[in-house]
Curated annotation (Swiss-Prot):
GO terms for cellular component: nucleus. CDD domains: homeodomain. Pfam families: Homeodomain (PF00046). This is Homeotic protein proboscipedia. One of its GO terms (biological process) is specification of segmental identity, labial segment. Residues 563-580 have a biased composition (Basic residues). InterPro entries: HD, HD_metazoa, Homeobox_Antennapedia_CS, Homeobox_CS, Homeodomain-like_sf. Its main location: nucleus. A motif (Antp-type hexapeptide) lies at residues 164-169. Residues 322-336 have a biased composition (Polar residues).
Length: 782
């Protein structure tokens, strides 16, 4: 039609047609037909309306009362395709796009190109029976192809002179204005009288207008009036049009995003929806660990706990070195991030920062419990840091659920940091006890770092009293550990462990250890003997004692134990430890339950010990009591979420073990101690296997769960230098409940084994593999 119209001279016809043609159906056939209008009965001047000279009159219908025109008009035969509606409307759009009135600017332009003046011609009365009776369509302009315009005048009224009815005029006017406006603005709204009532035609928006409107909608689903006015002015639309467009767009958006709660905000499923949804989709909180138990909450505010620990920690840690301000540095590290943390803080970050960087299990654990731990870990857990950082990734899964665990895990370090101070002891214990998870988390942190093990802040915090031993341990550890450290920067955790423990734990370097010893006395006071235990060989036992004590305290022993483990790695003990672990492991059948109560920590410790066992499981085992912290800290997360708990991340890997460990009697596998690689993955943790390669693994299969029976006290050894953090969360569970007290060793042993196995759980299987490949030390990384 458009083409036809354009070809025709009849000007206004085309324009009218364009504006008016609501009917696609108006298909005008070029063939001209002359029908006696009269025969049609009422010839309607349709054309007049549409400007399309098509008048479709059904026999019974007189369009607009135009008298039937006897004269034959040459008309393009409007096939009945024309909608009858056209008759009703009394106007046709000849344009093929009649369905959209003014929908396309091009149409409007096209019509305009036709001589606009011809509207009158367009109005010519066409008498046609649209009904198919005869389509006497008087297409004045556009419609009749080759139909002489002159023909129109032939209409009875005289084509041109056809009386213009008010409705015709109205239409013309609206058409003209709309055409004029249309070119500038697609959104012309015409009111066409239908049945004598004005009807608002659909507004057509130009691509430009639509683009701008969509763009605006993308940024703002709702417009304020000033902005609406501005847009209307810039787009040549009316305010109402803009407002209505936005309303419609919002509804469209809503439909698109029904599945999404965010329908309003999201613009389009294409544009707004995706964008909005993405933005709205709850971004993961940095601190997934926020949910950690209240006990660990301080940790989550790494600062508060860190600061608490700071004093003791700082003191203990001072020897550690710059890391000493583990709390602050850790916190920074933590917040800054696990992985990145190069410094101690970084290592802690893994534990502590997880919340942010890890945003995995680490996050929660760390945040909640890690701060202190982190601090402690700061020095002690650099290695851990790496391990953790990787671990933190693993963490994420278990992390949320096992937040407490994670916390504990982190806490372990933290706790140890706290442990440094008597308060820490109470806190650690309290944590451990009050929130099996939360508390556990705290202690474990250290341990987990302990992957850093002993050294990890936990040692200090954990074993304030323990530290004296840790000194020994540290010495040994330093010897071993340093070698280990030297061996593995990755083992930094050990390094840090060692350092930490050493520095922190009143290791050879540190006074803090003295403090810790004092603390140890406090912590240890339940088991004063732990001093002996401290000593490398006895460390296990001591750890156990400490464990007992520290279960609650969260691991001062743990740390020491770990240190010792690391230091001694007490391989011989390790074997012993191994056995112990096994025995211990067995004890911690509680698995998750333990996990919940002390056992859980123990489990952690456990595993750590297993791990430690692997590297220095001994420490852990010994620390079982504190291990809770240790375990918690590290394995806590593991525990909490088995697999997720990797607050340490890698250790978390053991998470699988985690759960197992919880379930499996500590999921001993969970050694976060990726360090435990040495221990065969035999642990029984399925998951842990990867980790538990601890040589001591003998207990490995089940984490030494089965080993549980093995030497509770003696367990301590497992020097797997690498790290304790793999510690047996898993192994520890059973231990934990009773293990705490008793389990220290038993659980520790179990834990160690378990820990070994679990070290890398799901997330860090690869890490654990690496760790396994490289060495327990490497596991610290995990």
């Amino acid at each position: 039609m458009q083409e036809v119209c354009s070809s025709l001279d009849t000007t206004s016809m085309g324009t009218q047609i364009k504006s008016e043609s609501p009917l696609n159906p108006l298909q005008v056939q070029t063939g001209q037909t002359s029908l006696p209008v009269g025969g049609c009965g009422g010839a309607g001047v349709v054309g007049g309306v549409g400007g399309v000279g098509v008048s479709v009159g059904q026999p019974g219908i007189g369009q607009q009362g135009v008298p039937p025109v006897p004269s034959v008009l040459m008309v393009n035969k409007m096939t009945p395709n024309c909608d009858k509606r056209s008759a009703d409307t009394a106007y046709w759009m000849t344009a093929s796009e009649g369905g959209f009135i003014n929908s396309q600017p091009s149409m409007a332009e096209f019509l305009n190109h036709l001589s606009p003046e011809s509207p009158k011609i367009g109005t010519p009365v066409g008498s046609g029976a649209i009904g198919g009776v005869g389509v006497n369509v008087n297409v004045n302009v556009g419609v009749g192809v080759g139909y002489p315009v002159g023909v129109v005048p032939q209409t009875p009224d005289g084509m041109d002179s056809v009386p213009e009815y008010p409705w015709m005029k109205e239409k013309k006017t609206s058409r003209k204005s709309s055409n004029n406006n249309n070119q500038g603005d697609n959104s012309i709204t015409e009111f066409v009288p239908e049945n004598g009532l004005p009807r608002r035609l659909r507004t057509a928006y130009t691509n430009t207008q639509l683009l701008e409107l969509e763009k605006e909608f993308h940024f703002n689903k709702y417009l304020c009036r000033p902005r609406r006015i501005e847009i209307a002015a810039s787009l040549d639309l009316t305010e109402r049009q803009v407002k209505v467009w936005f309303q419609n767009r919002r509804m469209k958006h809503k439909r698109q995003t029904l599945s999404k709660t965010d329908d309003e905000d999201n613009k389009d499923s294409l544009k707004g929806d995706d964008d909005q949804s993405d933005s709205n989709s709850n971004s993961k909180k940095s601190c997934q660990g926020c949910e950690l138990p209240s006990d660990d909450i301080p940790d989550s505010t790494s600062n508060s706990r860190g600061h608490n620990n700071n004093t003791p920690s700082a003191t203990n840690n001072n020897p550690s070195a710059g890391n000493l301000t583990p709390n602050s540095s850790l916190e920074t590290g933590i917040s800054s991030n696990l992985m990145g943390s190069t410094t101690v803080s970084a290592s802690n970050v893994i534990s502590a920062d997880s919340s942010v960087a890890s945003s995995v299990s680490l996050d929660e654990d760390i945040e909640e419990s890690s701060p202190i731990k982190v601090k402690k870990k700061d020095d002690g857990q650099v290695i851990k840091k790496e391990a953790v950082s990787t671990s933190s990734k693993a963490s994420p899964f278990g992390y949320e659920n096992s937040t407490p665990s994670l916390v504990s895990f982190r806490r372990d370090s933290d706790a140890s940091a706290v442990g440094n101070a008597p308060t820490s002891k109470a806190v650690g214990k309290k944590r451990f006890q009050s929130a099996a998870n939360a508390i556990a988390t705290p202690t474990p942190l250290s341990d987990s770092n302990s992957g850093n093990g002993s050294g990890g802040g936990p040692a200090g915090g954990y074993f304030p009293g323990y530290y004296p031993s840790p000194k020994q341990q540290q010495q040994v550890q330093q010897q071993q550990l340093h070698p280990q450290q030297q061996q593995l920067p990755q083992q930094q955790p050990q390094d840090y462990y060692g350092k930490y423990d050493i520095e922190f734990a009143a290791s050879p370097h540190h006074n803090p250890h003295n403090k810790q010893q004092a603390l140890h006395g406090e912590y240890l006071s339940p088991k004063p003997s732990s001093a002996n235990f401290h000593q490398n060989s006895q460390q296990q036992q001591q750890n156990d004692h400490f464990y007992y004590n520290y279960n609650d305290t969260n691991g001062t022993p743990y740390l020491n134990h770990q240190q010792q483990h690391h230091h001694h790695a007490q391989h011989h003990q390790q074997q012993q430890h191994h056995q112990n672990h096994v025995a211990d492991f067995e004890g911690p059948v509680n698995g998750p339950s333990n996990f919940n109560n002390g056992a859980y920590y123990d489990n952690m410790s456990f595993q750590q010990q297993a791990q430690a066992h692997q590297h220095q499981t001994v420490v852990f085992q010994q620390q079982q009591p504190h291990q809770p912290a240790a375990i918690n800290h590290q394995h806590m997360h593991h525990l909490g979420n088995g697999e997720t708990y990797s607050a340490l991340g890698l250790q978390m890997e053991n998470c699988e073990g985690y759960n197992n460990f919880g379930a499996a009697g500590t999921g001993g596998g969970y050694y976060e101690a990726g360090q435990q690689p040495p221990i065969p993955a035999t642990h029984g943790h399925g998951h842990h296997p990867h980790h538990v390669q601890v040589p001591a693994q003998a207990h490995a299969p089940i984490h030494a769960h089965h080993n549980s029976a093995a030497i509770p006290g003696g367990v301590g050894v497992g020097p797997p230098p690498s790290h304790i953090h793999g510690f047996a969360i898993n192994g520890g569970p059973a231990v934990q409940g009773q293990a705490f007290g008793n389990n220290g060793s038993t659980a520790a042993g179990t834990a160690a084994i378990s820990g070994l196995e679990n070290s890398n759980s799901s997330d860090f299987n690869f890490l654990s593999n690496l760790a396994n490949d490289f060495a327990p030390e490497y596991y610290q990384l995990s």
